[in-house]
């Protein structure tokens, strides 16, 4: 006899589930049953030996269970805490200059083109498709200063089913490429229009995020007004901080009355428990303490930090100060759109800091796996909704098949002893790519393979 009033189930999976908790950086749950409700939430995750009990409780038949192959596994969707959707148009090229020169020569001219909404639609459609195919179920996007094309990005992410924050970029100081700039009044007015229109559309999983580019491109007035907009509407905030030594020095010269880079944001109401700041390579212990006190987060972007020769973020130091942190691809300063690349680079950067005796230990692959999933969800304030397979959270997940057609991974007899081994999981994280990601789910809905409607 079924229990009364139980909601219908959209999915019941049996197999291996790999996720993180705050006490365990990588937990491998073999031969488990996971149920997803019609609303996309996880309603049970228990050992398969409990099938009979669960079937009675949730009214399902054995034929409704989808059994994974012994080499397949589910892991949480990857969370990209920092990506410039507009820069995808030149990703994989033009990374031969340090940050400030790179912005002037390549980035601002490329972003200027997004006043053309046809061009914007092509680029944004491709970047959302590409990131979803590569397992990014949640993305925190920078768009450009153009409101209409930024709204288009929100529409496209919603259409494809990706969970996202979308930000219209704000900047009123840009002497190096003056064609790509706003007045203070324009920036505030257009941000208010952007936020208002996005909120009116009532997307289920796409939200606006207030986006001052960085302190060098925003006046104090603009930053203060943006902080007020975020406070009024209870919105998230994203920007950049302490990415490159020249940038840090330039901020000091532009804003000499502030204690440091963090103080510029803090005094202008931009450092809150809904703020995520990219990079942070040169933050002092004093600044990290302020991040902790405010509840602000850091997006660690190792590919970009290396590719533009910006610096190394000491993640262990960030964690020591109990600051929330996730990973970001930072396309196109980071040339890869794949969060798997971000995982690999984060491990390498941590190893470099160990080699150089900055730290006495390195981050493990398991710890970085947690940063890319649960850590990223926490950095974006979504850890109550996504990030792992805890009951009550939404089912944001990717199905991994290490033996997929044309897989870049070779598996051997020793990789399997009845159940999937941790070696296979490691091989995917180090060697795998989108060919191994067979299905992607956001909020319980399968979004990859793509439906014919998109």
Curated annotation (Swiss-Prot):
Q: Mind listing the GO biological process terms from this record?
A: guanine catabolic process
Q: What does this protein do?
A: Catalyzes the hydrolytic deamination of guanine, producing xanthine and ammonia.
Task: Please tell me which top-level EC class this enzyme sits in.
Answer: hydrolase
Q: Does the keyword Phosphoprotein apply?
A: yes
Query: CDD domains, per this entry?
Result: GDEase
Pathway(s) this gene product operates in, as recorded in its UniProt entry = Purine metabolism; guanine degradation; xanthine from guanine: step 1/1
- What are the recorded GO MF terms, alphabetically? guanine deaminase activity; zinc ion binding
Q: How is the cofactor bound?
A: Binds 1 zinc ion per subunit.
Output this protein's name: Guanine deaminase
**Could you tell me the EC number(s) of this protein?**
3.5.4.3
| Stored InterPro entries | Amidohydro-rel, Guanine_deaminase, Metal-dep_hydrolase_composite, Metal_Hydrolase, Metallo-dep_hydrolases
Q: Which cofactor does it need?
A: Zn(2+)
This protein's gene is called GDA
Question: What is the originating organism of this protein?
Answer: Pongo abelii (Sumatran orangutan)
Entry binding sites for Zn(2+): 82, 84, 240, 330
Q: List UniProt keywords, sorted A-Z.
A: Hydrolase, Metal-binding, Phosphoprotein, Zinc
- Give the UniProt entry's GO cellular component terms: cytosol
Q: Which residues carry this modification: Phosphoserine?
A: 453
Catalytic activity entry: guanine + H2O + H(+) = xanthine + NH4(+)
Oligomeric and partner information: Homodimer.
State the family it belongs to: Belongs to the metallo-dependent hydrolases superfamily. ATZ/TRZ family.
- Binding residues for substrate: 84-87, 213-214, 240-243, 330
């Amino acid at each position: 006899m079924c229990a009364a009033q139980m909601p219908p189930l959209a999915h019941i999976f049996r197999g291996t589930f790999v996720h993180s908790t705050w006490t365990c950086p990588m937990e491998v749950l073999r031969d488990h049953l996971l149920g997803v409700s019609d609303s996309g939430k996880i309603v049970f995750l228990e050992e398969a030996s409990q099938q009979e009990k669960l079937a009675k409780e949730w009214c399902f038949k054995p034929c409704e269970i989808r059994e994974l192959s012994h080499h397949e596994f589910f892991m949480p969707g990857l969370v990209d805490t920092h990506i410039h959707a507009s820069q995808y148009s030149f990703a994989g090229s033009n990374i031969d200059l340090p940050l400030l020169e790179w912005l002037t020569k390549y980035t601002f001219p490329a972003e200027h083109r997004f006043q053309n909404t046809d061009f914007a639609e092509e680029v944004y459609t491709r970047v959302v498709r590409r990131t979803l195919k590569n397992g990014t179920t949640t993305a925190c996007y920078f768009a450009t200063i153009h409101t209409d094309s930024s709204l288009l990005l929100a529409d496209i992410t919603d259409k494809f089913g990706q969970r996202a924050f979308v930000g219209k970029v704000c900047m009123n100081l840009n002497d190096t490429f003056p064609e790509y700039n706003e007045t203070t009044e324009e920036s505030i007015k257009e941000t208010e229009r952007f936020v208002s229109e996005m909120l009116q559309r009532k997307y289920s999983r796409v939200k606006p995020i207030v986006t001052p580019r960085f302190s060098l491109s925003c006046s104090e007035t603009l930053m203060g007004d943006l902080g007020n907009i975020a406070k009024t509407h209870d919105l998230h905030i994203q920007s950049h901080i302490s990415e490159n030594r020249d940038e840090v020095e330039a901020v000091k010269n532009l804003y000499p009355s502030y204690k440091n880079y963090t103080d510029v944001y803090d005094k202008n109401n931009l450092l809150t428990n809904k703020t995520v700041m990219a990079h942070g390579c040169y933050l002092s212990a004093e600044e990290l303490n302020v991040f902790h006190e405010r509840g602000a987060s850091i997006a660690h972007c190792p590919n970009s930090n290396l590719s533009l020769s910006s610096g190394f973020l000491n993640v262990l130091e960030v964690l020591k100060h109990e600051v929330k942190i996730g990973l970001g691809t930072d396309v196109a300063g980071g040339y890869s759109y794949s969060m798997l690349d971000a995982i690999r680079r984060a491990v390498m950067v941590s190893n470099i800091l160990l080699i150089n005796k900055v730290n006495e230990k390195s981050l493990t692959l398991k710890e970085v796996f947690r940063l890319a999933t649960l850590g990223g969800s926490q950095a974006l304030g979504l850890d109550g909704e996504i990030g792992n397979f805890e009951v009550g959270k939404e089912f944001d997940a990717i199905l991994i098949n290490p033996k997929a057609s044309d897989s870049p991974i070779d598996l051997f007899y020793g990789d399997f002893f009845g159940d999937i081994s941790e070696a296979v999981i490691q091989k995917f994280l180090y060697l795998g790519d989108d060919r191994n990601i067979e299905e992607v789910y956001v909020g319980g809905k399968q979004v990859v393979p793509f439906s014919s409607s998109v």
